């Protein structure tokens, strides 16, 4: 008797299932890369010294490049967070750190911004947390 019940339920389930399912949607792919060569420095017309294509009638941010600020202040990867810090503790941490008040465009400019904000030092830190910079080093182009 149990066999007949199970067979009836199975047969009913087979009849209740639809026979034609819609096909899956086609896969989406990323667009192909451009077939032309991109110009250097983002716009091809800048000269990187602030006197080129920026500010006033230009096409950049004052240095002829894209909005990267001209040069890399901090190395890519772990030490990529620019900070202005007051005190270094054994080379492991820096105290009283904050993001620079203006965007620096090179190492000496980064130092002058930090000095103007209370005599702080320009640093590149791994993990800035609540005014504490963990594992910091000097930025590119500074001593």
Curated annotation (Swiss-Prot):
Induction summary: Expression is induced by carbon starvation.
Major site of localization recorded for this protein: secreted
Pfam families: Hydrophobin_2
Cellular-component GO terms for this entry: extracellular region
Native source organism of the sequence: Trichoderma harzianum
Cellular localization per UniProt: Secreted, Cell wall; Secreted
Gene3D superfamilies membership: Hydrophobin
Sequence repeats: 41-42, 43-44, 47-48, 49-50, 51-52, 53-54, 55-56, 59-60, 61-62, 63-64
Similarity comment: family membership: Belongs to the cerato-ulmin hydrophobin family.
UniProt region (10 X 2 AA repeats of N-G), positions on chain: 41-64
Subunit structure: Homotetramer. Further self-assembles to form highly ordered films at water-air interfaces through intermolecular interactions.
Keywords linked to the UniProt accession: Cell wall, Disulfide bond, Repeat, Secreted, Signal, Stress response
Keyword Signal: yes
Coiled-coil region: none
Function according to Swiss-Prot or TrEMBL: Aerial growth, conidiation, and dispersal of filamentous fungi in the environment rely upon a capability of their secreting small amphipathic proteins called hydrophobins (HPBs) with low sequence identity. Class I can self-assemble into an outermost layer of rodlet bundles on aerial cell surfaces, conferring cellular hydrophobicity that supports fungal growth, development and dispersal; whereas Class II form highly ordered films at water-air interfaces through intermolecular interactions but contribute nothing to the rodlet structure.
Biased composition (Gly residues): 42-63
Disulfide bonds: 74-124, 85-97, 125-136
Disordered: region residues: 20-67
Protein name: Class II hydrophobin qid3
Key word Cytoplasm present: no
Stretch forming the signal peptide: 1-17
Comp. bias intervals (Pro residues): 20-37
């Amino acid at each position: 008797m149990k066999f007949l019940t199970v067979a009836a339920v199975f047969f009913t389930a087979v009849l209740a299932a639809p026979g034609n399912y819609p096909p899956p949607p086609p896969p989406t792919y990323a667009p192909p890369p451009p077939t032309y060569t991109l110009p250097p420095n983002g716009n091809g017309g800048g000269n990187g010294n602030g006197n080129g294509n920026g500010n006033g009638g230009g096409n950049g941010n004052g240095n002829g490049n894209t909005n990267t600020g001209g040069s890399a202040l901090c190395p890519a990867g772990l030490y990529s967070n620019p900070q202005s810090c007051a005190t270094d503790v054994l080379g492991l941490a820096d105290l009283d750190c904050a993001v620079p008040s203006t965007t620096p465009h090179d190492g000496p400019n980064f130092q002058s911004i930090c000095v103007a904000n209370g005599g702080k030092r320009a640093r590149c830190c791994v993990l800035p947390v609540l005014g504490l910079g963990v594992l910091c080093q000097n930025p590119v182009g500074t001593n």
